[in-house]
Structures are given as C-alpha cells and as structure tokens.
Amino acid sequence: MTAVVRRTRWTAVAAAGAVLAALAVGTAAGPASAASGPAAVVRQDAAVPPLDRAAVRRVLAGLPTSEVSGALVHVSGRAGRLDAVGGIGDPATGRAPDADGRFRIGSISKVFTATVVLQLAAEHRLDLDTPVQHYLPGLLPASFPPIAVGQLLNHTSGLPNGADGPWGDGTAAWFVDHRFESWSPERVVATMDGQEMAFVPGTAQQYNGMNTFVAGLLVEQVTGHDYAHEVQQRIVRPLGLHDTSVPAADDPALRHPAARPRLTVPGPDGTPRQVDVTEQSPWPWAEGGLISSAADLDRFVTALFRGRLLPPAQQEALFTVPDVPTHHSSHCETGPDAGRACMSMGLERTKVGGVEIWGKTGSRPGWTNGVFATRDLSRTVVYSLNPTGLDGAETPVIMQLAGAVFG
C-alpha cells in the first residue's frame, strides 16, 4: 500500500487539525507523559475575543459549494454562544442541516476511547507504562518491541499503519462500492502482520488510528465487557449524552441525521453522480465509529475539561504533550513548533489567533468534524461539514470558520 493511501486512510481527517495549526501564531510544548519523556507546561497567552456571529454566518452563507454541501457550527462559552447552519442538509428535499441532528464523528471517537483508558488507569486496572503486550499477548507481531499503553494514547508507539484493509485506495469511488463492508478490530490490527515498526516507541509522534484499535481491544480485555458497554456506562449515561452511541458492527443506520451527505463519484459513463452515504459500515469502532451531535460533544468536552471524568493525575495526562519530534505525520507540521509533537493522550493542541485550544478533528466519508475549546472553556466550538469528496477540498471553509470563531 502506498504512502498516499496511508495518508488518506488515517489522516485525511487531519485536514481540519492542520488548518487550525496553519492559523496558529505559536504553540509551546506541554508537560511530559511518563511514557514519552520530558516536556514543558503550556499556558494560554491570549484572551478569547468576543464572538463575531456575523462573521460565522457569512462563511455559512457561502454554502453550498461543489466541495461542501452543508455545515453546522455550535459555539458556547462565556465569550459568546451561537448555533448556525448553512447550505443543504438533504439534497433530496433541499432542507438545511439540522443543528440538533446526529453525525458520524470519526476520529473524535479517539477522545472517548482515551478517556476510558485513563479511567482504567486511575482505577489501577491497567498501568500506562506497562507494555500493551502484557495485557494482550499475541495480538501484535512477536517481532514488535514492548509498547507502553500510554504510547498508544499519545501516538508515540511507532506502530506501522497496516497493509491493505477496509480503507481501500482512499478514493470516493472505492468507498461508495465498499461502504457496507464490515471489519472486526482484530482483523484491522492483523493488517500490521509482516510490517516493520515506524520508529522506536517513545522517540517520535505519528498520528495512527491503529493505536486506538489496540486501545479499544485493551479496554475489552481489562474490563471483560464490550467497548460499547464501557463507553455507555462510563461516559454516555453519566453525562446524559442522548445522541451519542457506538453502533453495532452490522448497523449502518444513522438515525435523526443532521444531514444526508452525498459523495460525488464517476458514473458508469464517466459523468459525475452523487451517492448518499448516510448509511455506511461503522467499522472504525473505537478509532472512529461513534455517532454524536454538536450538543453532546459540547457536553462531553465540558465535563472532560472540568475534571468530571478523570482524577487529577489522569487529567494532567490529558493536557500533556510529549517533547518529541513528529515522524512523517500530517499533524503538527505548521506553526512555530512545526515538526514537534502536538498530541496528548487524547487531545490535539494548537493556537488560533494567539488563543491556545485543545480538541480533536474527525471525519468519515461525508463528514468532516471538529471539537475544540480553550482549557478554561471560555470558548468551545463544534463543527460538522459535509464534503462531497475525500480530497480535503473543504479545508478553505474550515479555515474561514476557524478565523471567524476565534478572531
């Protein structure tokens, strides 16, 4: 599998994170995790400006375009609130996106997974410095070196990307033809068989969804319960997240969708046609298969940042970035600290307009999403766009929204 395909598979969703980083005026290194070496504490050094609601609405008024059919934006915090939509949510009816509807959150699922693993660490049911091979013997190739659990969470494991799998060739046409195929997490992890490690664990950072598949299997091994059960009992139910779920592997449905996105692909005669991709396999599972809504993601991040889900030691890990370089990663490659790690055990850190924000991007074909907040929650933003392709052409819209939301 080529490097281009690997980039499409795990990091096409990173376009939003890269855009936010591109807007950054600077980032600094955060405190280190036990698994990854030294780091320094980061402080927010710019106040959040008043929310320019008109600027956000102007961006949304430019939709639909050939690259983005619709979008929703949810902003909260003491510096201003807004719920707004733009473009078309359902091309069949022409209706606008539903600001209260659900969408496939993609890699934002990783934050839920990391939170559960950190909770298990707080309960002394696993140790972040213990090799994952201790808990899951035989899962990884025997040739792989010991990989600490914490290194899975902050992407310093050095795991390879995996060979041919459910991501195909990364094109919209391939996805449309295979969108209902389901892969088990074990089968996805097995695509690493025969591959070499990308780097020595703990020496660099490379965004890789394979880390989170292994972390999800770790949750099941340690608890004896399904991953979905643990997310439900530990996060969804306590916080009252009524729109958030981990779909069953054989359930492609999306109930009460915010939008019914369509991908543009070549028809039989070569002319473009649009295919509704609302229903699709949730095979990304703990790595990227969850469903949620803007309100639920806001509630989750608010509880997470306020320490309602994690005790102090694990909360510190959530806001800790290892002091290591990146390794062939689309993340952390812009701004004054380009080439240095920007991801913690669950979150990504960047700056926009001098304001330090933490959060996560995530996408599935048909959706490009993000949830970011200042650590003091003076501003939280959730966005969900509906791109018509898989080539990152929605990036300019995200840039405009980021600039409008954070000034």
Label each PLM-derived region with a short phrase.
Residues L82-A84, T93-R95, N161-A163:
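Short, solvent-exposed loop/turn elements at domain surfaces
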